[in-house]
Amino acid sequence: MNKLVTVTNKEVISSLKKENVTLLYPLQFFCVGYETYFNIDEIDDYCLVNRILTDEDIEKLKETLSDSHIKGIFFDDLGVIDAIKDLNIKKVLILDHIAANYRSINYYLDYVDSIVVSSDLTKDEIENIISLAKKEVVISVFSLKGLMYSRRNLIKNYHTYYKLPNENIINASIENKHFIAVDDELGTKFYAYPYYNALELLNLENVLFYWYNPIFLDKDKIIKLVIHNDITNIPNDKLFLDKKTIYKVGDINA
């Protein structure tokens, strides 16, 4: 089984390497929403690029990757496709909400090696896409689901305006909806809480990687989750896996 894990805690690296797990490192300056980032010379597996990039940023990324030893890259900015087209590495596109049907996925697969299938879908919809995709795809099986990303420092600005002690990570809720927000110099990322649990999708065919994104979990929980699929004491939910996404009022009773 091809498990891919975002490195959100440096203490787990050696343990996961012993289990032949593929590691995905958030790349310093080109990534947001994490507690830990890595310089390119620290990365010997896959790197993650998930922030909004300017023309200058893409040129900087191209230069950064040119002499690297990475095996592949996960990214969500389409401009990166052109910047890395001559690099002999695996190229995986993260389209999130857009990668929700096999036609869109197969179109983009002409330009990249794989695509992360949207987690806004039911189990049946995901299985159908996988069966019709012309290349192996990536499936998110455990993660905090990203809600939004702003290049503004929303948390810092809020604390400054109200003269509150600054925190770069906050837990908040609106009625019965909970989320976690992470702030750093490159912007603010919001995640839905609890964790998205799609572990029942493991062992499907035509899958390049099963992606675990264990942000905010401690070392022991990450090891148990990734190696044993043990989610004891980790709040989780299937979200849309067993119910359709509500797009409009008419869908509420669908």
Report the location of each language-model feature.
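Active-site pocket-lining/capping segments in soluble small-molecule metabolic enzymes
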Residues: 1-103, 112-254
